């Protein structure tokens, strides 16, 4: 059971929803050696408070020393690096217990242009939602993400879906086929073809997030974390045919590439 030490546990009750925030302090960033990446470029270095992590949790037990949570945290709130804060919250009107299933979704595009982008980018977006699912949906021709779980979504399952024949340019911010910025999301038994990042976890995604029994066929780039400090990420029985599974601080490499291209063009 995951428990958290707090200064005054008496103010909390079992069943309450809380937000736990872990700060990204200067000391933590320096310990990771991500304050500077060399090459004379300082803009890429992480800055304090730019990579704070916020988790939604439910209190399951009150103890003399603190509170216990329904789901463990994915990065330790270490007192050496500022510990963290806990706040009770309510989200009145938040959508929950909703599903999208048994559909075939197809984006119409200019058939004379195999890299047309003047058509639908996103098929399904999940925002401000809890306890939701997408199941047995067939996607074709979308330029961006066929399922995008945003940071305000939690407890989402995406399963038994297939994405084929995407239509777009080949490059950044395109074909992030199954993409999550949320927490407590599960993608299972997913198939995707010719994406860019077919199975992707975004910037500071709080997690845990899992991809299980998924297959990516002939993608143009890797699957994995596509920005910095996504934590609690699991890829289990995931086959990326023709590319890699990678966990990296992706923004650094993209920025360096852009600088090199600019110098070359000049």
What are these regions (language model features)?
Residues 1, 5-6, 10-22, 92-111, ...:
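Parallel beta-helix/beta-solenoid
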Residues 1, 54-56, 95, 121, ...:
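Surface-exposed or flexible loop/turn and strand-edge residues in extracellular/cell-surface modules
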Residues 1-54, 62, 68-70, 76:
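Autoprocessing Asn-cyclization modules and mimics
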Residues 6, 61, 69, 105, ...:
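Extracellular beta-strand solenoids
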Residues 48-110:
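Extended acidic/polar, glycine-enriched regions
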Residues 53, 120, 149, 266:
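Ligand-binding pocket scaffold of soluble enzyme catalytic domains
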Residues 80-90, 114-125, 141-145, 170-179, ...:
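Extracellular beta-strand/beta-solenoid scaffold signature
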Residues 96-107, 130-141, 153-168, 181-197, ...:
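Right-handed parallel beta-helix
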